Swiss-Prot record:
GO CC annotations on file: cytoplasm; nuclear pore nuclear basket; nucleus; transcription export complex 2
Gene name of this polypeptide: Pcid2
GO biological process: negative regulation of gene expression, epigenetic; negative regulation of lymphoid progenitor cell differentiation; poly(A)+ mRNA export from nucleus; positive regulation of B cell differentiation; protein transport; spleen development
Quaternary structure and interacting proteins, as annotated: Component of the nuclear pore complex (NPC)-associated TREX-2 complex (transcription and export complex 2), composed of at least GANP, 2 copies of ENY2, PCID2, SEM1/DSS1, and either centrin CETN2 or centrin CETN3. The TREX-2 complex also associates with ALYREF/ALY and with the nucleoporin NUP153. Interacts with BRCA2. Interacts with SRCAP chromatin remodeling complex component ZNHIT1; the interaction results in inhibition of SRCAP complex activity, preventing the deposition of histone variant H2AZ1/H2A.Z to lymphoid fate regulator genes and restricting lymphoid lineage commitment.
Compartment(s) of residence: Cytoplasm; Nucleus, Nuclear pore complex
PCI domain segment(s): 210-391
Protein name: PCI domain-containing protein 2
Native source species: Mus musculus (Mouse)
Keyword match Cytoplasm: yes
Length: 399
């Protein structure tokens, strides 16, 4: 394949289309396949050759693919992205013309994936040249992928086996990757609705479902819906193949903060196994109610946490750490009427700066409001009066 002529290549394309061989056709238009490195196929003007062998719109689609290999050979990703746009547009025309059949779904997967990758590369080249802002090309790519999604979602005529609806989840996952990259998470909402209401949602491939749950779980985390985030991210982690260490680690980066907010602390063995020791001091600090250690741990690994987009989520652990510290005060004093001064002493011991009795009341009021403490503040007696039953409810029942 790395040395075939243009005529041999086009003959293979013709046969794949003629026999409705989606998998072979997908390889012949994919940048994951070795033919793209063949100098004989990297052509600046392949239109005439393609028109001699292929019917429209496939002639236009594969001519654009050969121009794309030429552009990539010259490291011109802006041109490669333009060519890939033509490929997807031509494919869409052919795809819509395939009534009640879905043999071309693998082709759609290949061209959609390459579109996203080239959009990303083109973005980087344009930003370096100062010609556009980050995400412009990705945003345009998303619009084109949405056109593909609409074609798949509106296929109501075909039987379930031949339905284009099988392509919906792959496209949703590609769109999620773009929306997370350009920070437009609100655009995920209608896509989540479409998948959750689909009667195929449990029948897609495990790999696609893992990717979907991973992104929806991350979105739930940002929306502070920690129970749903835990459910979706746990599904992704548990179903991810054990050999995919890198992917499991990536899921854990988001699952760990969610679990911690729900009161489940990771073991040191788990953190070691997945090279996530950045969380070890955070875990220790929250468990012990040690605000001093928590602030130090967040500061020490701030760059890593910010890069992963979880720093602000981890900041929410401060309220849990207050709760654990104040629970220690309660266990130490063994009374249901706790002097506010006792909490003030505990906070000063943790080097909380400029803390006074008003701040103690403010923190306690927050903890009571959020359901972390069952009780009330008696301002007259300067005491916290806690419930005799379960004054510090388990975190998993509160969040």
């Amino acid at each position: 394949m790395a040395h075939i002529t243009i005529n041999q290549y086009l003959q293979q394309v013709y046969e794949a289309i003629d026999t409705r061989d989606g998998a072979s056709c997908a390889e012949l238009v994919s940048f994951k396949h070795p033919h793209v490195a063949n100098p004989r196929l990297q052509m600046a003007s392949p239109e005439e050759k393609c028109q001699q062998v292929l019917e429209p719109p496939y002639d236009e689609m594969f001519a654009a693919h050969l121009r794309c290999t030429y552009a990539v050979g010259n490291h011109d990703f802006i041109e490669a992205y333009k060519c890939q746009t033509v490929i997807v547009q031509s494919f869409l025309r052919a795809f819509q013309a395939h009534k009640e059949e879905n043999w071309a779904l693998p082709v759609m997967y290949a061209v959609a994936l390459d579109l996203r990758i080239f959009a990303n590369n083109a973005d980087q080249q344009l930003v370096k040249k100062g010609k556009s802002k980050v995400g412009d090309m990705l945003e345009k790519a998303a619009e084109l992928l949405m056109s593909c999604f609409r074609v798949c979602a509106s296929d109501t005529r075909a039987g379930i086996e031949d339905s284009k609806k099988w392509g919906m989840l792959f496209l949703v996952n590609q769109l999620f990757k773009i929306y997370f990259k350009i920070n437009k998470l609100h655009l995920c909402k209608p896509l989540i609705r479409a998948i959750d209401s689909s009667n195929l949602k449990d029948d897609y491939s495990t790999a696609q479902r893992i990717t979907y749950k991973y992104y929806v779980g991350r979105k739930a985390m940002f929306d502070s819906d920690f129970k749903q985030a835990e459910e979706y991210l746990s599904f992704a982690f548990e179903h991810c193949h054990r050999s995919s260490q890198k992917n499991k680690r990536m899921i854990l980066i988001y699952l760990l903060p969610v679990k911690m907010l729900l009161g489940h602390m990771p073991t040191i063995e788990l953190l070691r196994k997945y090279h996530l020791m950045q969380f070890s001091e955070v875990t220790k600090a929250v468990s012990e109610g040690n605000l001093l250690l928590l602030n130090e741990a967040l500061a020490k690994h701030e760059t890593f946490f910010i890069r992963c987009g979880i720093f602000l989520i981890l900041e929410k652990l401060k309220i849990i750490t207050y709760r654990n510290l104040f629970k220690k005060v309660y266990l130490l004093l063994k009374t249901h009427q706790l002097s506010l001064d006792a909490f003030l002493v505990a906070l000063k011991f943790m080097h909380v700066e400029d803390v006074d009795i008003d701040e103690v009341q403010c923190i306690l009021a927050n903890l009571i409001y959020m359901g972390h403490i069952k009780g009330y503040i008696s301002h007259q007696h300067q005491k916290l009066v806690v419930s005799k039953q379960n004054p510090f409810p388990p975190l998993s029942t509160v969040c």
